[in-house]
Amino acid sequence: MCLNPVPSETVVQQHSGKFPMYPIYSIGFLLLAVMSLFPGCQKMQQEESGGDKKSVLFDSDMVEAFDDGVAFMIMLGTDDIKIKGLTTVTGNAWAQESLAFGIRIGELCGGKNLTYIAGAQYPIRPGRLDSFNEEVDANPGENASYRGAVSYIEENDWRSVYTDRYNRQPEIKPSSEEASEYIARQILSSPGQLTILAIGPCTNIAKALASHPEIASQTKEIIYMGGAVWCDGNTTPYAEMNFLYDPEAAAACIRAPFPKQTIVSLDVCNTVRMDRQQFMAVYQSVHSEELKELFRWNYAYQLFENDPSATQLVWDLISAVIAIDSGIITGYRDARLDVDDVPDSPTYGKVYETQSPSRQIIRVPLQIDQNKFWDIVTSRLSQY
């Protein structure tokens, strides 16, 4: 149900027009001739055409398969994506637990040389998680039964999670660096080059901004999975779970002057539902039995085993595919957005549109090419 239906005229449809052929060819040949005389121009052309890999900082409340885990797998399997590192945050799972899951996926998917760091175990506001269940109970959303880490005993040791879960010793040693400092250091050492994929609560990014506010302008792009802009939330009627876990962090991030921000919100996530046939196509595209085991342990596998007619949203996976190929976006709206970060507010954690010029213009995808989306997912997974 949409709280504020998006007017059709505000949806920007991406399409290719038809232009006269000979002027384009003439100009193209002329440009190629000129650029061949100047090596610097050739390098610029290579960079603009994607000749260089896109560098990505992957920040996530990682789970083993759907949805963060599969997002990590397909990013690792994309030749023109270079993941600099994985930082974890509490959301779906505790940050230490997420680190164990991420390390195992990295071992199985060619990510042994990445940096792995357990990030923020708790949200920015002290005691925020203490009241989480009470808030949701008082104002439950459609998916209020799922509450992530707060539903489980807190995990504080990634190694014990790993060995208990996988009955083996890890091959990857994580870094002890503070996640927020790592994020800031990476951005400052490669200004204008890094894309942040933030598919969990925004705590690590917000902490990096608090200590190094200059990183916003030096980041190439940030892509979030979070929020519900013009539609209902899932955990409460107003808020989506990632942003509700740490509303203060979400607000700090989307208010920051990043050159380009994209929020993959429930507005588009709710349009992509995976049925059993599609899930089996994804599962069967994987060849590695060890990786398939992670899928079998996942809730999605069990869901379709118990109810073949069920469907499931894939949230974070959409953000990852957009990072790989933003051309899957077929409709979007650009708007100035903010987050309600007032703890006593009845709409705490809600993303909303504002006309305030002090807020950033953010792209909100509304439609994607679903055939292309699933083709990208299965083609990447088929490498394993």
Residue ranges of each PLM-predicted region?
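Active-site histidine-anchored catalytic micro-motif
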Residues: G50-N113, D157-T271, R276
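Bacterial N-terminal signal peptides that target proteins for export
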Residues: E9-I27
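Surface-exposed loop and adjacent secondary-structure segments within mature catalytic domains
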Residues: L114-K173
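C-terminal motif of bacterial Sec signal peptides marking the signal peptidase cleavage site
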Residues: P39-G40
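Bacterial N-terminal signal peptides
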Residues: I27-S36
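Conformational coupling and interaction surfaces
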Residues: G50-K53, F72-I83, M241-A251, K260-Y384
